[in-house]
Swiss-Prot record:
GO terms for biological process: proton motive force-driven plasma membrane ATP synthesis. It is found in: Cell membrane. The keyword Protein transport does not apply. Its main location: membrane. The gene is atpE. The keyword Zinc does not apply. Has multiple subunits with at least A(3), B(3), C, D, E, F, H, I and proteolipid K(x). This is A-type ATP synthase subunit E. It holds the Pfam family vATP-synt_E. It is a peripheral membrane protein. Belongs to the V-ATPase E subunit family. GO terms for molecular function: ATP binding; proton-transporting ATP synthase activity, rotational mechanism; proton-transporting ATPase activity, rotational mechanism. SUPFAM superfamilies: V-type ATPase subunit E-like.
């Protein structure tokens, strides 16, 4: 009987040991499964976040490109408007300055005579012909005779044989138009021509100064 009892006890021990080993293996498998599941979940979350971030970046890039595409014409329009307004302001300032200068010249007989003499002398020197007809503007008609004589005397050594004849008056404001006798040469020495010359010469310089000041 004792031997049977000992065998039973040994069997129980073996069963318990097997059960314990099975439980440990089961717990290990469950733990590994839980860890694997946790790992899968974490990887899934990371992938989802990566996809979400990538999608978000893609959307941001798309919106940014769309915004840039929509803003580009507006920026160009604003730039053109700014340039146009700058030119208009400069043009207005030039006009005011020129108007003041013209008023000063026309309001003073000495200035008118000086302008006429310098313009006539410059034109006579610029033309190759020595036989010239001087057509005065309406504002210079009353003094052109004296000025022509003075300029002819002053330039007689520079252009031997110089002959200046006063022609019919023109509708311009001040100054003269000089034409060679054969009609092949002409020189516009009017106040209007001088204004245009000054405007074309000064405007680029003013634009450059304004651009430098804003830079």
């Amino acid at each position: 009987m004792r031997g049977v009892a000992e065998e039973k006890t040994l069997l129980e021990v073996i069963i318990q040991e097997l059960r314990r080993a099975a439980e440990e293996e089961s717990r290990r498998i469950v733990k590994e499964a839980e860890q694997e599941a946790q790992k899968i979940v974490e990887e899934a979350i990371q992938k989802a976040e990566a996809i979400k971030a990538e999608k978000l970046n893609q959307l941001l890039n798309e919106y940014r490109q769309k915004a840039m595409a929509e803003l580009a014409p507006k920026r160009l329009e604003l730039r053109h408007r700014a340039i146009r307004e700058k030119h208009e302001l400069i043009e207005s300032a030039l006009n005011r300055a020129i108007e003041e200068a013209v008023k000063t010249i026309l309001g003073n007989d000495d200035y008118r005579r000086t302008f006429l003499e310098k313009s006539l002398e410059k034109g006579v020197v610029a033309l190759s012909s020595t036989d010239l007809v001087v057509h005065p503007c309406r504002g210079s008609a009353s003094i052109v005779g004296q000025v022509v004589e003075a300029v002819a005397a002053r330039l007689s050594k520079v252009k031997p044989g110089l002959r200046l004849e006063i022609g019919d008056p023109l509708g311009c404001t001040e100054g003269v138009v000089i034409v060679s006798r054969d009609g092949r040469e002409i020189y516009n020495a009017t106040l209007e021509a001088k204004i245009a010359e000054v405007r074309e010469s000064v405007k680029p310089k003013v634009l450059e100064l304004v651009s430098r000041a804003r830079a």
